[in-house]
C-alpha cells in the first residue's frame, strides 16, 4: 500500500546530529487525501516540509500544530532533512514518531531441514523438538530457479524447515511479520502456532499432500518481491529468549518443474535495536520511518503552524475551502501560497496553480426526484466574475461545458450536474440533481448520475464487456470489464416513497456480485462513501428495520439467480431470520434510474464488511476479522481460525474438555441456528460457497447469512423440498462444489459431541415449531412480495426483452406468481420432510407433542430451550424422543412460580423432559403483591387483607393438591380443623387470583 512517492520521501531523511538552520518551511498541505497511502493502508491528511537552504537541518524539538494557543501540539523527533529535500508527515491523529525495522531471519541463513518420506513427528513445529537428525542447509530451498542455496531433488513434494531465533524484550516489539517467496505453497509456525499459510489445504497437510489449490510461481528470481504475512497477537506467540520458526514448504506435485522456499522474519522495534540485521532492500521496510501527528486537518479555515526549537513560528499556512484531493502550498513561480489540483509529495509543487478555490456553491430551484410534469430549472449561487457550467448527461462539468444563461427546460428524465468557475481559481464542488418526468413508483427511488463513459464506454466502461477477444466467450464471461475491480465516481439521490425525506451523496461505484455479473443484463452495483468524493459516509436511514443510519457502503442487488423470477427469494429468506442471532444484510427495494433512464428495481442491501458488523454489535470495526469460504481472508488474518480448525481436525470432540474449548471459541447458539436455517432452506450453493464468518476480540466466531438464492431449491427443481440437506451438510467426501470436505468438517466434528447434537436437534425443532411453521413462512413470503409487487410490472417491462434473459415472458403476473407459488409449495411441505430427515440422520424413532398452558399471562411466561418465549395461553410444539428439552417458568415482577401441573408435577422452575409420549403441562404462578395473609404460621385463624377489598373466595389445597375446603366472600379462615402441615390458598378477588402458602402449626 506504500507507493513510490512516499518511498522518495524517505530518501531525504538523515538520522545524524547536524547543524541547526532556519531554511525549512511548510511546502504543501492536503486536508482530504485519497491518493497516497500510509503504512496501515489508510489515506490520511498530510503536511510536507521542504528544506530550501544549503544546510542539513535537524528538526528535533521543532513542532507542528493546528492551534495557535498550543504551538507545541506535536513535536518532531531526532530527524534531519537534507538541502533541497522534502519530508512528508501524515496528519492522521495516530501520533507516531519513529519505528525501527530489523530482520531477524534473513535470506541465506542456515536452517535444519528434512525432506520426509514418512509423516514427521507431529511435534516438529515446537521449540523443544529434537532435530539433531535433520540436515543443515542455507535458505532458499528448492530447485530449478537458480536462486536456491540448498538444492533439493527434482520432484520433491515437501521440505520441512526449522530455524531458532532470539527475542530480548517483547515489550519493545511493535509488530512482526513473515515475508516469504514460495513455489507452490507453505504453512509457517512459530513455537507450534500456525502464523501463515498459502495455497494449501489440510490441518496440517500431510507430508505428501498434493492438495495445493493452484500453481504459484516464485517472485524473487523474476524481479518480484516476497509475499508478506503480518503476525497477529505476537505477544502471545513469541517468547522472551529462544523461539522457533518452522515452515512446511510444498510443491504442487512431483512432476512440477520447480520449487522454492525463501523466508524472511522481521520485527519492528519501538526503540533503536541491534537485534537481527539491517533489512534487505527487497523487503521495503523504509515505510516504518513514517511520521504521524496527533491531529488531523480541517479543510475549512484552519491554520497549520510550524515552529522551531525556540518556539518561534517559522511558517504558517491557512487551509480554507480545499476540495478533496487538492492541496495548498507555495508557488514555485511567485513564492506565494496558492492552491493545486495535482498534489506532488516528494517533488516540486505543481506548475498548474490557482489563486484559491471557488467557495460558492450552485443552488437548484427545484429538488430532484419524480416530477409530474416538465419544469424550468434555474441555477444560482455565482457572484460577479463567475459563471456556472453544467451538463445534462451525468458527466462532470468541465471548462468546456455549457454556460448557464437562462432557465433550463426539463421535459424528459435527465441528470443535471453543475459547478461555478472563476478565472484563476479551482472550480467549486459539483452539485447534482436528477429529474424523472411523468413516472410513478410506490417504493423508494434511487437516482444515479455518472459520466456515461464510466459505465458504457466499449473500452473502459465498468458495465461493458470490453474489447472483443479480451474475455471468455461464455457465461459468465470472465475477463470482461464487469469482472474488474474498477471504481468510478458518481452521485446518488435517494427519495423515500410517500415522504419528503431524501438524501444526496457523492460516491464511488463498482460492479458487484458473482456469477450474475455476466448472467444478468441488469448488473448489481456497490456504492462507497470516501473522503475523495466529499462524503466520508452515507448518513441516512435507508433501512427501516435498523437502529443505525450510518453506512460506509451499500449495494443494490439484482436478485442473483432469482432475477426476473420472483425477485424476492434472497431477501425473503434472510429477512425470515430477523430478530434472531443471525447476522444478515437488511434490504429495501428501490426503483432505480441511471442518468435519467429507468434501470429497473433493485434490492438495496447493506454491504457485508467490518463496518456493518461493527454497527450491529457495537464493536470497533478496525479490530474485526472476516473470513470467507475455506478461511480466505477478507479482513484481518486467518491464523486464529486455522489454529482452531487444526485443533478440531486433530481432536475428538466427543470428549467434553475438547468440546468445551471449541465452544469457548465459537458462538454455538448462533452456529446451530445458522446450520439449521441453511439446511431447512435447502441452500445447495452452500456450505462450500457463500459462507462468511467473523470475530472480534470481544466475541466468539459467528457466521453471516447471505446470497441464499439457491435456498428453497433452485427454480428448475420443483420437488426440492424433499432434498436431504442435513445429510448433504454432513457429507464426508463431497465434490469440489458445493459441499467439499473442508466445508462440512466443522459440523461433522461438532455433531460427534452428544451435547452439541442435542442442542442442534432442539434448535432445529424450536425453529420448526415457530419461525419455520408453514403458515408463518407462507405469510412471510406474501408479506415480502407485497413490498415489491407495485414495481414488478415496470421492472419486467424494462428487462424482459434483454438479450441475457434467454426465454419469453408473455404474462408478467402469471410468470412471477409461478415462482412465488413454488416458494409457497416449499414452505408448506418442507416442515414435515425436515423432521423425517432429523429422525433418519440421528436414528430417532419418533417425535411427540408438548402442550404448554398458562391460564394467566400477566403472572409469568414459559421459555423452551432458552429460545422460545411462549406468549399465548396455550402453545403446542413437537420434539424428538431421547433428546431432552428444557422448560423454564419465568414469573413476572410481583409474582412467583408455584408449580407445574397436568401430566407431570414439579415445583422446580426448570424441568428437563425426554418426551416419550404427548404431554400436557400447566404452569402455575402466584401473586406476591400487596395482599397479606397473617398470622403465618397459625394454629387457628388466618386473616386476608388487601387494600380496597373486603372479601375473597378461597380454596384450600393440601400439599398433594387435594381440596381441603372452599369458602366464599370471607376475609378470615378458621384452620383449626386442618392437620398440621403446609397448605396453599387460592385466593380470588374481583380482579386478581393469588396463591399463598400457609403453615398450620
Predicted regions and their residues:
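Middle-to-C-terminal accessory/interaction subdomains
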Residues: 316, 327, 336-341, 345-353, ...
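Short, compositionally stereotyped local motifs that mark structural "simplifiers"
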Residues: 80-83, 87-90, 269-284, 301, ...
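C-terminal outer-membrane/trafficking sorting elements
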Residues: 895, 929-934, 938-1001
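Conserved beta-structured recognition patch
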Residues: 99-124, 284-345, 505-517, 789-795
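A structural motif detector for short, solvent-exposed N-terminal "entry" segments of globular domains
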Residues: 20-68, 99-101, 166-182, 271-302, ...
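Extended carbohydrate-recognition surfaces in non-catalytic/accessory domains of CAZymes
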Residues: 99-174, 201-230
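Aromatic-lined ligand-binding clefts that engage carbohydrates, nucleic acids, or primary amines
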Residues: 111, 134, 157, 165, ...
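Conserved ATP-binding subdomain of kinase catalytic cores across diverse folds
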Residues: 448, 466-636
